């Protein structure tokens, strides 16, 4: 598993969901976690630097998760940062759109700690983290 000091940004407009993901990450040994409530908030934090991984919801106000993902992939400084989409959008076309936009992984809500751990593990393995 990756460096436990890796800094995560959890992006979701629903504070309860952010807390759930934060707690699951903590269970996996990742305590360096910050939160953002939408894509605009997330971008401001990401541009300030220091993050190594983004876990983002899809449906959010101001800037949705797919737009955030595309913006991250278009930014030279952040383009290689892993982005895991965690969303209620289970439709095949959503999963394809996220993959085409460069998502590192995709988890459909609701999910278990084991599912999150498995997805993170696959991303870390693929990136050699």
Swiss-Prot record:
Modification N6-acetyllysine occurs at: 92, 109
Annotated protein name in UniProt: Chemotaxis protein CheY
Function: Involved in the transmission of sensory signals from the chemoreceptors to the flagellar motors. In its active (phosphorylated or acetylated) form, CheY exhibits enhanced binding to a switch component, FliM, at the flagellar motor which induces a change from counterclockwise to clockwise flagellar rotation.
Free-text remark on how the cofactor is bound: Binds 1 Mg(2+) ion per subunit.
Post-translational modifications: Phosphorylated by CheA or acetylated by acetyl-CoA synthetase, depending on which acetate metabolism pathway is available.
Highest taxon, organism lineage: Bacteria
GO cellular component term, pick one: cytoplasm
Annotated GO MF terms: metal ion binding
């Amino acid at each position: 598993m990756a460096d436990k000091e890796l800094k995560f940004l959890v992006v979701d407009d629903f504070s309860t969901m952010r807390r759930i993901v934060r707690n699951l990450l903590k269970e996996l040994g990742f305590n360096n976690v910050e939160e953002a409530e939408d894509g605009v908030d997330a971008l401001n934090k990401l541009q300030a630097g220091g993050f190594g991984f983004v876990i983002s919801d899809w449906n959010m106000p101001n800037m949705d998760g797919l737009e955030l993902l595309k913006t991250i992939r278009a930014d030279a400084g952040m383009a290689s940062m892993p982005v895991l989409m965690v969303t209620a959008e289970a439709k095949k076309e959503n999963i394809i759109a996220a993959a085409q936009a460069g998502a590192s992984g995709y988890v459909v809500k609701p999910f278990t700690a084991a599912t999150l751990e498995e997805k993170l593990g696959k991303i870390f393995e693929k990136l050699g983290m």
